[in-house]
Amino acid sequence: CTALTKINLPASVTAIASGAFGSCTSLESINLDNISSIGKFAFYNCTGLTELTLGENPVDISRKAFSGCSNITKVTVKNSETSLDSTGLAELENLSIYGHINSVAQLFADKNDIPFYDLKTGERIINEWVVDNEGVVWGYKGNETDIVIPREVNGIAINKIGENAFANSKITSVEME
């Protein structure tokens, strides 16, 4: 599959099966607007891909779907519920994610130290706190060693500290507002 450069799928196609386009190293463009399911290793080692845009509908992306796609530098996630966990994207260098504020994509970016940009404004969002939509604190990315966890972050009330939230950090004290 080294000659394939572009995939244009009709709206009737909503799923891409496991390994479907694996090692299509010349693939540069694919329309994923109507896709709701992407199988594991579906685009494994598609080194020609530089950008991905996931559509308005939630997309179920299986394990390592984009693993080895070493040249992807921009992922746009139009649906706030689409998760990028386990997709293979966290291993990429020079990746930026564009999505909605307080989305699952932003949480993924924050957890993995990937630059995140607001889809509406294009502005880079830098958070000290890694917090999900249910108020769970998953980490702190600031420089302080004595930290005070705020009552809310980005309008979300904090109610729990997540697993390994401060593991291997340089924090010396934690207090809650």
What are these regions (language model features)?
Residues 1-15, 24-37, 47-60, 69-83, ...:
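Structural signature of tandem-repeat unit edges
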Residues 17-22, 39-44, 62-65, 88, ...:
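Consensus positions within tandem repeat domains that build extended binding/scaffold surfaces
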